[in-house]
Amino acid sequence: RAKFHFDAVYDRGLTDLGLMVWSHAGECGPYNTKTTAGSNSCICGPTEVCACYLAMATGDNNYYEIAKNLYAKQRQYLYNPDNGHVYDSYSRYPEVSYNYWASTYNQGTFLGAAVMLYNHYGDAQYLNDAKKIADFAINNFCDETGCVKVCDTNNSDLDGFKGILTRYFRRYIIDMAYNDPSYLEWMQKNCMRAYNNRNSKGILFTGWNRKTDESTNYSAFGA
């Protein structure tokens, strides 16, 4: 069923730019999916990692090719290869524009795609991208102590974003950065900060840098 649903989404959502459509209307322009104007990293990155997971699960390397091609297009339109910054969105309707907001979600999924594609193809570009993506997150999302300070709400989809970053950061450490202890130390520092800020019930939420409140009802996505 995973293959069935992925194929349906990919066939319906791939645009003439080689990017995945974010919406069939609104800021993405006309309804015609194949010539829609917009795309977001929050759609492309997850599609890439999903394709890699399907390739691993099924043995069908065509899914790696899907991930590779989509990654190349996201890299072209939604990424700065000089500093590892993953852009939020791109649009050409009614004129070319970018949203340069960086999020733990988008850095995380593009990092995951880079790691998995490197593991399969061995192309040094993915290795170099992965390091820059990881370094951008450390250098731009953290406070002076090196702990992540962004995406720490309790009322939106931001609640779970850091979990996506840490999922693929862990994979980066294990698969690529095992010879550089600074990345593991960074991960451990953030884990300890979050854990030490749990409340008396053992609940910790996505605001790792402050004590989890005793009376607030936290979303399952963010706790």
Language model region names:
Residues 18, 39, 132-223:
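CBM-like carbohydrate-recognition segments
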Residues 1-12, 59-77, 122-140, 178-197:
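Extended, well-ordered alpha-helical scaffold segments
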Residues 28-33, 88-98, 142-152:
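Acidic/His metal-coordination segments adjacent to aromatic residues that form catalytic metal sites
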Residues 1-54, 64-65:
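Extended ligand-binding groove/face enriched in aromatic
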Residues 1, 46-60, 109-122, 164-179:
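Well-ordered alpha-helical scaffold segments within catalytic/enzyme domains
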Residues 50-55, 63-114:
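Active-site cradle of extracellular carbohydrate-active enzymes
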